[in-house]
Every structure is written in structure tokens, then in C-alpha cells.
Amino acid sequence: MQVLKGHFDIVRFLVQIDDLRFASAGDDGLVLIWNVETGDCLLELRCHTQQITAMTSYSFIRGRNAHAALITASSDRTLSLWDPDSGNRVQNISDLQSSVKCLLVLVRLDVWLSGGNELCVWNRDFELQCKTVHHSDAGISAMVELPKNFIAAAMDKEIVIFKLSLSGSDIVVMAMRHLADHQDTIHSLISINDGLFASGSHIGELIIWDSVDWTIQAYEHILWEEPAGDSQSEVKLKQIERSIQHMSSDGEYIVAAVGSGLYVFNVLMKSVVAYRKMAHDSNVLHTMLQEDGRLMSCSEDGSVRLWELQDLPLPAEPASSGFFGMFGTFGRSGKQTGPPAKKMPEIPGLRSLELIGDLIGHSGAVQMFLSFKEKGLVTCSTDHLLIIWKDGELQSQLRSLAVFQKLEENQKL
């Protein structure tokens, strides 16, 4: 592993720029660009006076060449466009009405969106095309692109469907539908595939939506335990334990970070595939599905863990019946009076989620990670550090291969 130093506060964001470069940003307002192979800090981008609240990258063709761009937003109510090749700040917007919480690039329309207390649509040259104002303290916290020029945006307990209407060079944005099926704040909003997207709330509600007609296709209310008492503190604790902090999908499965646990759902079968109620010692903050039935997670406990879906040889740990309700919870309505169930309900396709790797290196909560596949894995943390993790065996094989290739080239000469 390689420890990268350069930040002076919590590092919250990692964004891939290309096959070799990535950007990091956080509460110190700095944006640093790194080479994943060497660990070198290539550029230091200084502009924002307060913490970074959102960051994204995109590529575009100018002339015949491909170019990369980086957009950053800060709680100082500014937006900046950067050239990651030169480190120059190409554009800067400083008269925003509120801080931007999320960014979304629409490559097909050649525009990008910023979400906060208002939804703004910008062209590539940072010119404001249109905006819609919302008088909400929560504002827009997440956005996903939908077919036919629609956008889904999470606003507190609601998902608002916006339509982008194009007329010549003019763009107009308008709210078309308010989806108010969640009972608590939406923490995660992701695209699953061209036809589906998903949302997860603070009290464990996972809803899968149709991307075209915005109807509910599946509903999971994750309830593995009833509140142990009637006090407000105990109820609040249980809500935190089942809060969906993050979700990711490969189009076929969804992995949800629920409290300190992990839950994997089969989208087509509309059923749970595997789960770990205590996957970490504290809240899971970020997840990622990999190939071959593997997934990764990182947590406030400072660890990054690698998991594998395996066939279930023995009955899994018991769970409340409420967890397995597809269209609502069912089963217990009050406190459990008898001993806990010891037999797992018969669920077709249920598998176990087995720990196969544990990366320990950070002294603070791991906020997120970024995979460069064989080149390595990058993590960032509240300890102000980044770490590049590499597969030692794979790196040895790659070095050996490079040596053999060099020998062959020399022999040909």
C-alpha cells in the first residue's frame, strides 16, 4: 500500500479522470490530482475557501481530440470548472443562492446540472441555461438521469421528476411529478439500468422505480429488529441502524449499506440474495459491486472489506419476517413474546455473504473508495489521508511480464 499526504482535513470525494488519474477533495477546500500508478500528486487546485460539497468529471471531444474536465462545488457557494491537464481554472461562478449538494453531467445533451435549493442547468461553457427554485431547507441531495430527457431528484422525503424541454438552443426545466412514497429522508438515489432506478431512506425503505412511468416495481422495508423499548432514544437508535446510507448496482443486483450491515437484492427476481446484519463495527459509508459475485464496502470503523457471494451450505442467521416483505412489511406488529426464530425462512436463491479480505490502514472513517482494477484501489478518510492499495501477487506478475517483454524486445534487436 502507498499512503498519500496532501490534504489538511477530511477527504470525502474521489473522482476518476482517466485510466491513470484521479482527483481528491474534502473539507480543506483543496482539489488534488494524483497518478494512481506512481502515487505522485500532479496538480494542486486552489480556489474554494470552504469545504467541497460535490465533484464530478467528464470527457468531451474538441476538434479531434478527447479532453477531460473537472467540476467542483463548495459550501462557499461557488462552482469551478478545471482543466486537469494544466490545472487552470477555466470558469468560476460565485453568485449562487445556495450551496450545491450534487452534480450531474448529461453527455447526450451536452449540459450539466447542479442541485441545491435550486436546480440549475448549465452548458459546457458554464453559461446558465435555466433554473427552478425550491423553497426547501433540505434542497436537492442527489440526481439521476432518466430516459427521454427526464431527471429524478431527491428532495427530503420526495423524489421530484423534472423534464428538460429543448427548443432550438433554449432549454427549459419543469417539475412533472412528485413521488411521495417514502416516509423519511432519502439518503441514496441511484440508476440501476436503462429501465429502473432505486432510492433508499433513513428508516430502511428501498424502492425500485420504473424509469419511464415512475411506478413502484418493488418495495423493501428493511426491519430486522423491533424497537426494544418505547423511549425516543431507543427508537432513534433503531432508525440509525437501518438507515440506507449508500447503494450501488451493476444492473442486475443492488447492494445497500444499511446501518453497519450489507444487503444484496436481485433486481429481476425482486428478492434478497444475501445479507450481513453486522458487516462492519460501525456504519457502512460506501459500497461497490465487482465481477464474479464479489463486492466491497468501507465504514466508519476505518476498514475496507471484500466480500464474496457463496452458496449457502447451512441455515443463515435468523431475521425478522419484515425484512423479506417485497411490497411492505408483514408479520409481527408488536413486541416479540416468544423466543427468536432459529430457522431461516425458505427463500429461493438465498446465498451467504462471506468475508474474504480486510484492508486496515486508516485511523479514521473511510469515506469512499475508487477502483482502478488491476492498477489498484484508492481510499480516502477522515484521517486526512489517501491510500493506494495494490494486489501484491498481481503486481509481481505484471513486473515479471514487463521484464520478459523487455528481454524479448532486446533479443529481436
Report each predicted region and the residues it spans:
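Surface loop/turn motifs at the tips and blade-to-blade linkers of beta-strand repeat domains
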Residues: L4-K5, L45-R46, I93-D95, T132-H135, ...
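Terminal intrinsically disordered, low-complexity extensions flanking WD-repeat/beta-propeller proteins
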Residues: S99, E118, L128, G139, ...
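Short coil/turn segments that connect the beta-strands within blades of beta-propeller domains
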Residues: D19-L20, F60, H67-A68, R108-D110, ...
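Canonical WD40 repeat/beta-propeller blade segments in eukaryotic WD-repeat proteins
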Residues: F8-V15, Q50-R62, S98-V105, D137-V144, ...
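Solenoidal tandem-repeat scaffolds enriched in leucines and small polar residues
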Residues: R64, N88-I93, Q97-V172, D184-H187, ...
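Short loop/turn segments that connect beta-strands within beta-propeller blades
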Residues: V36-T38, P84-G87, R124-E127, S165-S167, ...
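Conserved beta-strand element within WD40/beta-propeller blades
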Residues: F22-G26, L70-S74, V111-G115, I151-A154, ...
